Amino acid sequence: MDLTEEVTGKRELPGFSENVIFDEEVICYLHPLHEMVMKGLCDFGKEENLLLLISMLIQRYGQPFENCIPECRGEIEKACRFMEQHFAERIYLDQICRYAGLSKSTLLRAFTKSKGVTPYSYLENIRIGEAKKMLEQGFPPIEAALRTGFSDQSHFTNYFNRFISLSPFLFS
């Protein structure tokens, strides 16, 4: 299924009447996506931001379509369980979608509607929570970072600072 069909539920390309748009919320997705691509960071985060950005552009500026986001409570809970069980591994959006039985677009929209955060943010919250426990138990920050699924200590420190407002070194 192509992305447009996943987002709109229709097998037709959306039309866009505006060539240039000024939308602060679009920039909020575009800027982190650009940073992730330029720094070669997390594929999951890049894919999620790209899909959310494209979905937003189609919904706001494409031809109108029904914006029906299914509840999918059971599927969302399956996605949460998958992330809770596999947080220390490199996780891809495709894996979560297969496990939950939802398309990428449906998972992103329904998950965000249900949980108030994107799947990637949910995963990062789990990882930070587990890393906090490890730091409290005396693990060095680099070990906590690697055991909780962060690719390196720098990535871990940035997320930890953002979520906890302290560096892992000060926290421990």
What is the meaning of each model-derived region?
Residues 6-64, 68, 81:
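Amphipathic alpha-helical segments enriched in hydrophobic/aromatic residues interleaved with Lys/Arg
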Residues 49-61, 86, 126, 130, ...:
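Amphipathic alpha-helical segments in well-ordered regions
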Residues 1:
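Glycine- and acidic-residue-biased ligand/ion/polar-headgroup-sensing regions
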Residues 111-118, 159-171:
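A secondary-structure capping/hinge motif
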Residues 65-67, 123-132, 161, 170-172:
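Short, basic, alpha-helical segments at the C-terminal edge of helix-turn-helix-like DNA-binding modules
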Residues 25, 29, 71-79, 115, ...:
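N-terminal positioning helix adjacent to the helix-turn-helix/winged-helix DNA-binding module
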